[in-house]
């Protein structure tokens, strides 16, 4: 019984630490199955902004993934970017929890480089 208590406490702490991440992903799920289902997909990127947000928050947590998603939403407009824009595999260099804007890519996309030089923004 005593060996079960530390494991249970660790499981509880792990579940509590995932709560913000799951709440953010839950909001995206609600958006996808309500408003987005009625209006349809109008995103200029692949993956869509809601898919990007779900993946970013799932991978990096609500704080960092939320900032990445905010920057993506700002870029997704008629005068913004378009094309392939995947969630980065690792946090960008210089990103710290107290400098949250550094998690986000505010310009450009990270699609495959075609060698033309315009992806170096």
UniProtKB/Swiss-Prot annotation:
Pfam family, one: YidD
Topological type in the membrane: Peripheral membrane protein
InterPro entries given in the database record: Membr_insert_effic_factor_YidD
Record localization: Cell inner membrane
UniProtKB keywords: Cell inner membrane, Cell membrane, Membrane
Gene Ontology terms: cellular component: plasma membrane
Keyword Cell membrane: yes
Family listed: Belongs to the UPF0161 family.
Function (record text): Could be involved in insertion of integral membrane proteins into the membrane.
Protein name stated in the entry: Putative membrane protein insertion efficiency factor
Upper classification of the organism: Bacteria, Pseudomonadati, Pseudomonadota, Alphaproteobacteria, Hyphomicrobiales
């Amino acid at each position: 019984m005593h060996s079960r208590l530390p494991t249970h406490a660790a499981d509880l702490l792990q579940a509590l630490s995932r709560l913000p991440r799951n709440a953010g992903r839950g909001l995206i799920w609600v958006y996808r199955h309500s408003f987005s289902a009625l209006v349809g997909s109008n995103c200029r990127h692949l993956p869509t902004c809601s898919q990007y947000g779900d993946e970013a928050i799932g991978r990096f947590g609500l704080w960092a993934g939320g900032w990445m998603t905010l920057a993506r939403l700002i870029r997704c407009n008629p005068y913004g970017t378009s094309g392939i824009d995947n969630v980065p595999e690792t946090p960008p260099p210089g990103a710290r929890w107290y400098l949250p804007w550094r998690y986000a890519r505010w310009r450009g996309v990270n699609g495959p480089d075609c060698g033309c030089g315009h992806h170096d923004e």
